[in-house]
């Protein structure tokens, strides 16, 4: 976070003021470090509209942006632990998962200053990761990126101790009638549990060409990229698909929810 950016959002805070009944759009940079060491940065948004909080990817307000992972957005009543998560599967079907996520925050006596704002450090074990979070008591918004809320001030930074994820506050804007609104009410999104959702992912991972394989077994002609496919061809294609998923699937913020945890191939 540079001094220029910090100064920009501090000016906005000073001019507009903040309250518990706020209408704010908070922009965070998220840096994700992949297992091969590759680092990817993107912008995510947290809209606080009175008693409602929406956390989402840039693609929901920026045309042409592609999804960066399976978890697309999170909606909740601000200050509560009841989250509704918008997710996709490998076939781009959309689902909604309702979760209760109570974070057991441990407040520390560690402080640092960002410009004139004093930040306090808090820690929590969440989603199979240990998290260090810096929040500002002077900004009485009990919110933050992803599911990191419930602290006595706005979250400025959140990072897991393995360095896989790092959220950094970029700036704060006022929400108004002229603000571009995210389209989170995805049509045909099906309500589902984490368990059933992970089973869908796992089943497709194990047999992504099930219909094509079964059709070929019945003697039907299957053509893929101008090549007639035999039953045995789908075995190699499946292994290639699985290798691609293991290499390219973005890390999960909640590592203990990753459907690949118990996969050995």
Describe the role of every protein-language-model region.
Residues 10, 15, 109, 143-146:
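Exposed boundary/loop context
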Residues 10, 16, 95-97, 159-162:
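Homeobox/homeodomain signature
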Residues 14, 19, 113, 147-150:
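Generic detector of intrinsically disordered, low-complexity, polar/charged segments
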Residues 20-114, 118, 127, 131-132, ...:
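Extracellular or lumenal secretory-pathway regions
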Residues 25, 31, 141-168:
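Structured soluble/peripheral alpha/beta segments that form catalytic or ligand/cofactor-binding pockets
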Residues 96-99, 123-149:
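Covalent nucleotidyltransferase core used to form phosphodiester bonds in nucleic acids
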